[in-house]
């Protein structure tokens, strides 16, 4: 569904030509606009898919693994804390915030983020755009991490409900 919606949006946007961008993308040689949805002709004629919250997901997986290894009896407590946005369990939140985090030169957390990014990129690139080219993962979230964070509940990394997601591939903590 995502690929079909993105392709429809690309065709609609294709009505608006972008000659200056097209020249920089090889359109001067081919004479084809980069937004032309019927013909390939520019060097980079792909479609992107914005990926949000990489650090939140990676940090959450690390926090869950840590909790289950160190304090398996608190698994249900974690679920309750997330459901209530940590309102009644600040100690659990502080524990989660103290777990290893992506972007702090900690191998386990950084490898978790890399594995997630690789898997997501593989899934996204398996989809084709309107010209048959693969979609590409785009981890540069232009301020949409603020908007999307508003709609995401509390997460196991200690992030509270409606707080922003991490920007692009930047660490949140």
Tell where the protein language model's regions lie, with residue ranges.
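Acidic, glycine-enriched catalytic cores built around paired aspartates
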Residues: 1-173
């Amino acid at each position: 569904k995502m690929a079909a919606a993105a392709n429809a949006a690309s065709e609609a946007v294709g009505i608006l030509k972008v000659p200056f961008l097209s020249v920089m993308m090889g359109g001067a040689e081919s004479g084809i606009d980069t937004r032309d949805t019927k013909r390939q002709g520019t060097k980079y004629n792909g479609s992107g898919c914005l990926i949000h919250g990489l650090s939140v997901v990676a940090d959450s997986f690390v926090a869950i693994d840590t909790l289950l290894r160190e304090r398996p009896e608190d698994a249900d407590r974690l679920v309750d804390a997330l459901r209530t946005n940590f309102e009644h369990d600040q100690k659990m939140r502080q524990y989660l915030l103290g777990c290893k985090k992506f972007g702090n030169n900690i191998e386990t957390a950084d490898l978790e983020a890399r594995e997630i990014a690789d898997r997501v990129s593989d899934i996204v690139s398996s989809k084709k755009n309107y010209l048959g080219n693969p979609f590409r993962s785009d981890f540069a979230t232009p301020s949409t991490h603020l908007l999307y964070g508003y709609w995401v509940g509390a997460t196991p990394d200690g992030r509270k409900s409606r707080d922003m997601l991490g920007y692009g591939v930047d660490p949140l903590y």
